[in-house]
Amino acid sequence: MAKQRPSSKRWLREHHNDPYVQQARREGYRSRAAYKLMELQEVVKEDGKSLLLIPVGANVVELGAAPGGWTQVAVKLAGVEGSVVGIDLLAMDPVPGAEILVGDFLDDAMLAQLQGLLHEGRVDVVLSDMAPNMCGVKSADQLRGEALAEAAFQFVEENLKTGGNFAVKLFNGPGFHDMVKQARAMFTVVKVVKPDSSRSRSPEHYLVGMGFKG
């Protein structure tokens, strides 16, 4: 049997002891990432009040939905009056209250299937917590992460309603500031944050855009 590398052992130990992992297990969430979306929900403030990323009744599309932690939270936030569609290349277990589609979200056939579920054309909220399969080479991992974020931006430009909201994972890299600049041109309010529930050594940040200009 192959021995685990020290880095793998350290990750497993930290994962097991992670308070967010333990809380997710207690509360029935599929991943600790659920708490990141909870933090992003009210991260934008205006005149001392929180602007909700996912308003009650919103039609939400989540890109890269597996394993479903964000999907579970989105269903709760949108409520029975809203709708949630999760899309991923990987099959995942059903999430009560959500529709799950398997495929490439930029594929024409997938977009046609999505439109059939929405009935209203464009959507109110787009979410993306997508991350690449890490190869361990920093520059390559950064480029892969940027490619996923760019695909999410493309989906937003083609499918988000005017006035809609967007949350996307970004990684520190050569294209980070250009993406933030792009978002500021697309949205009325833009905020970049690192949630408390994000691991401190992770290079990930989240961009929240409110009020899509269309």
Curated annotation (Swiss-Prot):
Keywords: Cytoplasm, Methyltransferase, rRNA processing, S-adenosyl-L-methionine, Transferase
Predominant place of localization: cytoplasm
Binding site for S-adenosyl-L-methionine: 68, 70, 88, 104, 129
Alphabetized Pfam families for the sequence: FtsJ (PF01728)
Record's GO cellular component terms: cytoplasm
Cellular localization per UniProt: Cytoplasm
Coiled-coil region: none
Reactions it catalyzes: uridine(2552) in 23S rRNA + S-adenosyl-L-methionine = 2'-O-methyluridine(2552) in 23S rRNA + S-adenosyl-L-homocysteine + H(+)
Record EC number: 2.1.1.166
One annotated GO molecular function: rRNA (uridine-2'-O-)-methyltransferase activity
InterPro entries in alphabetical order: RNA_methyltr_RlmE, RNA_MeTrfase_FtsJ_dom, rRNA-MeTfrase_E, SAM-dependent_MTases_sf
Active-site annotation: 169 (proton acceptor)
PANTHER family the UniProt entry points to: RIBOSOMAL RNA METHYLTRANSFERASE, RRNA METHYLTRANSFERASE 2, MITOCHONDRIAL
Family named by the database record: Belongs to the class I-like SAM-binding methyltransferase superfamily. RNA methyltransferase RlmE family.
Function: Specifically methylates the uridine in position 2552 of 23S rRNA at the 2'-O position of the ribose in the fully assembled 50S ribosomal subunit.
Entry protein name: Ribosomal RNA large subunit methyltransferase E
Encoding gene, per UniProt annotation: rlmE
